[in-house]
A protein has these predicted regions:
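Conserved alpha/beta-hydrolase "acid-adjacent" motif
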Residues: 115-121
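Active-site nucleophile elbow and catalytic-triad environment of alpha/beta-hydrolase enzymes
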Residues: 81-98
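Short beta-strand/loop motif that positions the catalytic acidic residue
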Residues: 102, 108-110, 114
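Active-site loop/oxyanion-hole signature of alpha/beta-hydrolase fold enzymes
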Residues: 1-7, 155
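A short beta-to-alpha transition loop/helix N-cap that caps and shapes the active-site region
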Residues: 40-51, 116
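Catalytic active-site module of serine/aspartate enzymes centered on a nucleophile-bearing elbow/loop
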Residues: 132-134, 139-176
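Conserved hydrolase catalytic core segment
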Residues: 5-44
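A catalytic-pocket lid/entrance helix-loop region that shapes and gates access to the active site
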Residues: 48-72
Length: 176
């Protein structure tokens, strides 16, 4: 965030947990909004079940090859993430407390067919957030709406960013 100088960013996060913790624990007056893509605030049964299934897919399909494009040590990245979520002690993981301290508008983009989380995540945000929560439920998308429905995802993020950055007539440019 320090690299942004005096810019007033809207945080767009595929790492929604990290963005939630940041905006809920830092009153960074440069941030004017936060868009959370497929967020997790708690662990759900569907999360654990799907993460257990993906472990099998990692061992039996070309998933490792696909992920190696993004991770230098793909086994460490995958098994670190997978093992954490499947650890019985992780079932109590809950970051919803941070939501109450977010002081900027929140957009949540949630795929209808998210295999890792349900609308309960959205309900938690609506219950806990002090600021407005704008929810876009994206048909035809699962846990990666930015990849599975890029047009709808970009439209929702652009609309949110333009609203929170007060871009209304095009004369100042458009946020995307």
């Amino acid at each position: 965030m320090e690299l942004l100088d005096d810019a007033a960013p809207a945080v767009v996060a595929r790492g929604a947990s990290i963005a939630t913790i940041y905006t809920g624990s830092h009153q960074d007056h440069r941030v004017e909004g936060v868009a959370l893509i497929a967020p997790h605030f708690i662990v759900e049964d569907i999360s654990v079940a799907s993460i257990a299934q993906i472990r099998n897919a990692y061992a039996t399909t070309n998933l490792k090859e696909k992920l190696s494009r993004w991770h230098r040590d793909v086994d460490n990245a995958f098994y670190g993430w997978n093992g954490a979520w499947l650890d019985p002690d992780f079932r109590s993981w809950d970051i919803s407390e941070y939501l109450a301290y977010i002081r900027v508008p929140v957009a949540i983009l949630q795929g209808v067919d998210d295999q890792y989380g349900t609308m309960r995540q959205v309900e938690i945000a609506r219950e806990e957030c002090y600021c407005p929560v704008d929810v876009t439920v994206i048909p035809g998308a699962g846990h990666q709406p930015h990849r599975e429905a890029p047009g709808a995802t970009l439209d929702a993020i652009s609309e949110f960013a333009n609203a929170v950055l007060h871009v209304d007539d095009g004369s100042q440019g458009r946020a995307a």
